[in-house]
Amino acid sequence: GTGHVVYTMFPIIADIALQKNIRPERPMAVASVASQMAICASPVSVAVVSMVSILAAGHGIGQAYGLLDILMIAIPSSLTGVVMAALWSLRRGKDLDKDEEFQAKIKDPAQRDFIYGGGETLLNTKFPKEAYWSTWIFFAAIAAVVLLGADEALRPVFTIKEKTGPLSMNLVIQMMMLIAGAIILMRCKVKPGEIANGAVFKAGMVAIFSVFGVAWMSETFFQAHMPLLKETLAHVVQAQPWTYALVLFLISKLVNSQAAALTAIAPMGLALGVEPKLLIAFLPASYGYFVLPTYPSDLACIGFDRSGTTRIGKFIINHSFIIPGLIGVVTSCTLGFILTSILL
């Protein structure tokens, strides 16, 4: 998952915040939110590619919107949402020296060593040339995905079940990433045995079961009850098309996945007559699973914050991610609506 790269950043953010006497909750909570909001602006995310497929000309919606059209709206709107959430986070909570609970905690020498110990720096560290090679190989794979997504003519064409069309972008992403991974493994002196011990790999394996399993189950449920859902929501969405964003937000929380929510709800929106431009504008509404802190990146964020300032509240819903998430999504959807009115 594209958002899971944040696991490598959490320990760094926590250490720097503590060294600078900054309340770790301020940067860490919004970092977790930002990692998921960026999925809507990533050319290699399944959510964006799913939207490209749904809005393709073959779905009979008139004008087709491609990858670049979506990114032209999604990148500035998502970035603005993240910036607004970050600005709000600058002053959230008490400073560490004024936080009675934190000060009481560090009076225990063992707790103080646990919270402030273990900080390491990579400054003045010389990395092997293979580290730079692997970075550029990864960027090259992303560039290839963007290029293939921008121009269908570059993709091979296949005929499946008497229907001819270019290779799916879902498959293109998988192929490019697997090729890049194979090249890095062979050329950059990676020790295969150490891959399974990495934090990102472990988090990805957890995500496969905790996210993919839930998404698959919920997708099965929604597909079975789609006629009832369409009938129930049709009148609301047709009367007020903007309520599509609320429906998408709710379903996203239920399925814990942006891609699964879009796959289930975006085609329904088109079938109900929602304008394709609105689907692009409200793409950030597919990130609704911050409402309850059950997503792996949120749980990891809480675990990496040794100070305990990033947490789940007594009433569950009053957790560290709820307000940054709401600010980010509402801002992104609002700006997305304005940009689609101007640019598309």
Q: What residues fall within each predicted segment?
A:
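Hydrophobic transmembrane alpha-helices that form the pore/transport pathway of multi-pass ion
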Residues: 1-62, 258-290, 340-342
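Juxtamembrane and boundary regions of transmembrane helices in multi-pass small-molecule transporters
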Residues: 40, 51, 62-127, 288-344
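Transmembrane alpha-helices that form the ion-translocation and gating core
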Residues: 239-261
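Structural signature of hydrophobic alpha-helical transmembrane segments
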Residues: 3-4, 171-179, 232-240, 287-291
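Membrane-interfacial segments
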Residues: 4-5, 55, 59, 92-100, ...
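Membrane-interfacial loop-to-helix junctions in multi-pass transporters
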Residues: 19-27, 200-204, 231-246, 270-279
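Hydrophobic transmembrane alpha-helices of multi-pass small-molecule transporters
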Residues: 91, 100-222, 323-344
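Helix-loop-helix module between adjacent transmembrane segments
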Residues: 1-5, 30-43, 74-82, 215-218, ...
